[in-house]
Amino acid sequence: MSGRAPFIKPVLEYNEHGWGPCEELSVDVPYQPFCKSDRVGKISDWTAPPTERKFANKYVSSFGNSNQYAYFHEDDESTYHLVDTSGFKGFRPFQRGRFRGNIRNNPRTRGRTGRGGAVTGIGGNQPGVGVNERTKYGKGRDNRRQMGRRFGRNAPTRMRESSVVVRSDWVSIEEIDFPRLLKLSLPNVKEGQDVVTCGSLEYYDKTYDRINVKNERPLLKTDRIIHTLTTTDDPVIRRLSKTIGNIFATDEILATIMCCTRSNYSWDVVFDKVGNKIFLDKRDNAQFDLLTVNETALEPPLDEEGSINSPHSLAMEATLINHNFCQQVLRGGDQKKYQFEEPYPLEESGVDLVSIGYRYKQWDLGNNIILIARCKHNGVLQGPNGEVQFLSIRALNEWDSKASNSLEWRQKLDTQHGAVLASELRNNACKLARWTVESVLSGSDQLKLGYVSRVIPRDHLRHVILRTQQFKPQEFSTQINLSMDNAWGILRCLIDIVMKQPDGKYLLMKDPNKPMVRLYDVPENAFESSDEDDLSDDKLFLLSN
């Protein structure tokens, strides 16, 4: 019995004052962080060498890998430090099949696995092209354009030309990038008040609201004359500048400045400062009145000389389409017209002018800045209650859906007109924003949009009307994310900059290749030509068509 080990009774913790463990715990045991998701097989690492070479650390816990969780039993205050909250990238646990591709959904492996048959491509069978990617001609979708941009290799940047050549004697005053302009805001600008109204408007023909792709109408050419007067050439603005206002402009110029953050092409506006008055004008022989086409598209039209699909040719075509469309949808002839208070100042006997009505409106922008702007309407409409509704009529044009990489209108316009409009908002964001701002400034009740397409893509002279659509300008501006507070803020910022300068002529130009605008101090005779009576081909085009 004496050779046996004595039995020692173990000490049991007994809580006399409650239920559960004792309150006095062992404070000498350091805390070791742990993870409940650690694999149980980790204990086998103690008895045998690891056999995993590729994933040797798959059983390693993600806790305790950093010194921020280490335990130091010291009383030295120098070891006290704050916890790093910048983020800790822990160990990624082992995942089986992590680097394998998705075989089921990978089109490259369908030919090997036998799932998903090969379909016909261009000239024969091509594996890897799904059945849903066929076109109606039996050709597979061409993915060469997408394959050329893999791994972040974007298309080469196109260097655009500026709208005007910057001369060496011009002084740069200010350079403002678009992110700064997008932060500007001028809220609580009240609706403009009418000062003078002149001209006459024809009534809208409601039969054009029933046009669809199957019931298209040809676009007719009109011989009616339209005058594109600048700010300083307008006789009404000259008369008003003597009594009221200190900022004078037209709705096209204001819309260009207000929507400058959406533009990609270069443009310019002239600021003439005389005393405390500023005239916002456009240069003579400039292409300011031409409408851009696919300006904000991912692949804008190529600048090929002599091509009908070059940016300049498309701009001329779009301008002619808008001029003809806004007159064709009106009931002309001997029908009654809506007459404004004053006749058109340039109205002549025997000259057939277009249906257009001008409103010269006044806005108070604060800080003693009174804006006088000429706005316009294209037609009127008899409302359901007999009221008169003013219209702004514009037209979108389709030139070549395959070349522009957009939806084909004749297939989608009747069934998916919302998708067509979304595509146009993406490709022509700046142009649609300008039209919306012009409609809001003039106070139009409706914005009529027409969809005009070529008869065949290779003929840029014959067009057909496929559909019309109408919007309320205020609601449409909300849909396209157009903030009028930001638009007024951009205009007010540029006016304040020019107001601080001495009297003279200044040029605001959109940089052709960078998202910014530049303000230059130019000489008084910077844009004077040898013969001011000569008109450019673009202005003759606008006046004669």
From Swiss-Prot:
Segments forming a coiled coil: none
Gly residues compositional bias, start-end: 114-127
One GO cellular component term noted in the UniProt record for this chain: eukaryotic 48S preinitiation complex
Segments for region (RNA gate): 287-301
Molecular functions per Gene Ontology: mRNA cap binding; translation initiation factor activity
Swiss-Prot/TrEMBL keywords: Cytoplasm, Initiation factor, Protein biosynthesis, RNA-binding
Cell inner membrane listed as a keyword: no
Region listing for Disordered, in residue ranges: 99-158
Skewed-composition ranges (Basic residues): 99-113
Gene Ontology process terms (BP): cap-dependent translational initiation; formation of cytoplasmic translation initiation complex; regulation of translational initiation
Cytoplasm keyword on record: yes
Function: mRNA cap-binding component of the eukaryotic translation initiation factor 3 (eIF-3) complex, which is involved in protein synthesis of a specialized repertoire of mRNAs and, together with other initiation factors, stimulates binding of mRNA and methionyl-tRNAi to the 40S ribosome. The eIF-3 complex specifically targets and initiates translation of a subset of mRNAs involved in cell proliferation. In the eIF-3 complex, eif3d specifically recognizes and binds the 7-methylguanosine cap of a subset of mRNAs.
Family in the record: Belongs to the eIF-3 subunit D family.
Domain notes per entry: The RNA gate region regulates mRNA cap recognition to prevent promiscuous mRNA-binding before assembly of eif3d into the full eukaryotic translation initiation factor 3 (eIF-3) complex.
Protein name: Eukaryotic translation initiation factor 3 subunit D-2
Organism: Drosophila persimilis (Fruit fly)
